[in-house]
């Protein structure tokens, strides 16, 4: 009977909220991060989790960069089938630009994450910019003087 009484208290409006939001055993960590207005009574030494630095959270340039990365990724999802269904020079040059941008931004993030030191990181990013420019120039040269990206991939598939 005592168990049913305690279960009834826990399942009431206040008891269920207390069980689900206040108990560290039940509450997942990601919920804890967003419940920062009232600390849990009886718990000391809890830290507030900040998901992003406050000085970068309002940056319009970072938001536009993130959005443009997603636009290029979605554009690639449409260009690849378009290159298969309708291989033409417009799709070839669009693929050259989108693939170069996508790989440049992706490798740039790897450089940012894993290359340490300001001078080394700047030199690596300068090298990446040079390689990306040469890649785009090479793909455009290939599109202009040869069969193009779409037809070249189709020829490879026929092998």
Curated annotation (Swiss-Prot):
It is a multi-pass membrane protein. This is Succinate dehydrogenase [ubiquinone] cytochrome b small subunit, mitochondrial. GO terms for biological process: cellular response to hypoxia; mitochondrial electron transport, succinate to ubiquinone; proton motive force-driven mitochondrial ATP synthesis; regulation of catecholamine secretion; tricarboxylic acid cycle. The chain crosses the membrane at residues 64-85, 91-111, 121-142. Belongs to the CybS family. The gene is Sdhd. A ubiquinone binds at residue 114. Component of complex II composed of four subunits: the flavoprotein (FP) SDHA, iron-sulfur protein (IP) SDHB, and a cytochrome b560 composed of SDHC and SDHD. Residues 1-56 form a transit peptide.
